Amino acid sequence: MGSKLSKKKKGYNVNDEKAKDKDKKAEGAGTEEEGTQKESEPQAAADATEVKESAEEKPKDAADGEAKAEEKEADKAAAKEEAPKAEPEKSEGAAEEQPEPAPAPEQEAAAPGPAAGGEAPKAGEASAESTGAADGAPQEEGEAKKTEAPAAGPEAKSDAAPAASDSKPSTEPAPSSKETPAASEAPSSAAKAPAPAAPAAEPQAEAPVASSEQSVAVKE
């Protein structure tokens, strides 16, 4: 009886040790699994935080990009506004510079103009007086006055020639206008007052000479 009990105890002890080893192994495996789970949880949490941070950074980057784009657009708009402003300023400056030289020739041309106009009416008045006197007086007196009228014509032309020579080339047309009244005076006086052919030819010959002298003075 005693031997059986001892065997049983020994066997029980052996079984107990095996069971304990199994329990320890099971507990170790359980602890390892728990450890892995615990480790994976922080990793998952870290991944979640990283995803959140990246998601937050993306809107920030997008906002920064939009702000930069708006700034670029504003700079472009400002540059476009400044460019048209600079162009009108340039055009205004050019317009101010261009009219400045223009008034000088205009004034110079206006100065000889009235002088020529003033001299031409005087010559016309002299011719009118000479023709009126020639109509009322005898033929002999008309011939004498005709000779005086052409003499006065060259004098007026000679007076006008220096003035034309002093002026610039832009005022050269003025002498031509002065020459026409003087040239018309001689034929008109010759046609109105009946006179011999010889005295009438002499004034006409004098008129071309005076015109040639005037042209020479203008060229000088």
From Swiss-Prot:
Protein location: Cell membrane; Cell projection, Growth cone
Protein name according to UniProt: Brain acid soluble protein 1
Organism whose genome encodes this protein: Rattus norvegicus (Rat)
Residues modified as Phosphoserine: 40, 91, 127, 130, 158, 165, 167, 170, 189, 212
Designated gene of the protein: Basp1
Tissue note: Brain.
Phosphothreonine, modified sites: 31, 36
Gene Ontology terms: cellular component: chromatin; COP9 signalosome; cytoplasm; growth cone; nuclear matrix; nuclear speck; nucleus; plasma membrane
Cross-link (Glycyl lysine isopeptide (Lys-Gly) (interchain with G-Cter in SUMO2)): 25, 85, 157
Lipid-bearing positions (N-myristoyl glycine): 2
